[in-house]
Amino acid sequence: MPFVVIITGIPGVGKSTITRLALQRTKAKFRLINFGDLMFEEAVKAGLVKHRDEMRKLPLKIQRELQMKAAKKITEMAKEHPILVDTHATIKTPHGYMLGLPYEVVKTLNPNFIVIIEATPSEILGRRLRDLKRDRDVETEEQIQRHQDLNRAAAIAYAMHSNALIKIIENHEDKGLEEAVNELVKILDLAVNEYA
């Protein structure tokens, strides 16, 4: 039975670090898929774009088609290996927040778990300010909290359409990273029995 875990978190929360460390420690052999990368690969194959930045400019209908292609590909991969899908629950746009996974995509992926990585707004803001390599939006602590609240609401909507369990993992500055990694490993290890 396919085992799919969706992992989300706003920029600066530590999602990539936690994911990398958890994948090194889990007993299950997960395949990590970045949903946006898979969509981009599909768009390049179809001759729609050459660069990642062009993705945002594609018509919404085309973007939805690319999302479905990516979801179907992930569903096929999940027949062989457990899959960890790195994606955004919500995406901040200049016009408002957009759901990262539309209804049809969630139904197709049918995740077992939706994991949200969170931290306090002040911790996230501090991490963003220290990470000068990344080009990130400047947000206030209030805006960061709103984005995290919207991610929780999106996760609930996704779970309603897939029967997934929601797991919120907190990644705090004071000894939080190790605890966060261990919590994710516990979830990932549940896949071992599915592929035995």
From Swiss-Prot:
Gene3D superfamilies hit by this protein: P-loop containing nucleotide triphosphate hydrolases
One cellular-component annotation, GO: cytoplasm
Keyword Ribonucleoprotein appears in the UniProt entry: no
Residues bound to ATP: G9, I10, P11, G12, V13, G14, K15, S16, T17
EC number(s) from the headed UniProt entry: 2.7.4.3
Keyword Cell division included in the entry's annotation: no
Catalytic activity: AMP + ATP = 2 ADP
Family, similarity comment: Belongs to the archaeal adenylate kinase family.
Protein name: Adenylate kinase
Organism whose genome encodes this protein: Pyrococcus furiosus (strain ATCC 43587 / DSM 3638 / JCM 8422 / Vc1)
